[in-house]
């Protein structure tokens, strides 16, 4: 669908919608707004739009929980709210949030990453919010916060993270279907 936006910066990873999608060029509180929804917690991820669903990450910093939300694209109704992790939030820049990574969706599953407890946590979920697989990459220290969104390429989910702890980082690929490490 030309109007789908399956990952951060859109279908071509350049922030440009297809001309045939005819996105609105102007909007305000009363113009070109289909629906609005309260988002529990705080997050800086971009909405991901695939088919009849909109996905978004959020974090409740008081309860120290991280969630993936799924909305009905037409109505804005919350279809599900999946708590992914709870507890052990680390240092973060106060201008960042613990839900800055955007969801990536291939139409079959959704993928996202969070940072907490000195770990990068990456998950795959079904379109109904059921956990398919999870990866935990330990030994990370945040300088300004974490915000890298998973990149989908062929059968891979590619993950990247910088690391204040040792000056190194992470660049890895896992299989979309089963989460097995590819490189």
Regions from the PLM with identified roles:
Residues 1-183:
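Noncatalytic, solvent-exposed loop/strand surfaces
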């Amino acid at each position: 669908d030309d109007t789908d936006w399956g990952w951060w910066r859109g279908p071509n990873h350049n922030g440009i919608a297809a001309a045939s999608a005819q996105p609105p060029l102007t909007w305000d509180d009363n113009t070109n707004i289909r629906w609005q929804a309260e988002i529990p917690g705080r997050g800086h991820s971009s909405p991901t739009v695939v088919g009849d669903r909109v996905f978004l990450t959020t974090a409740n910093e008081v309860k120290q929980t991280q969630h993936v939300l799924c909305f009905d694209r037409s109505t804005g109704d919350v279809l599900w709210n999946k708590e992914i992790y709870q507890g052990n939030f680390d240092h973060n820049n106060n201008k960042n949030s613990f839900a800055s990574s955007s969801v990536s969706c291939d139409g079959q599953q959704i993928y996202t990453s969070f940072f907490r407890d000195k770990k990068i946590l990456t998950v795959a979920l079904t379109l109904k919010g059921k956990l398919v697989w999870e990866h935990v990459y330990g030994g990370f220290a945040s300088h300004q916060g974490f915000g890298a969104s998973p990149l989908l390429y062929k059968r891979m989910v590619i993950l990247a993270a910088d690391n204040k702890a040792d000056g190194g980082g992470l660049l890895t690929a896992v299989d979309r279907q089963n989460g097995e490490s590819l490189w």
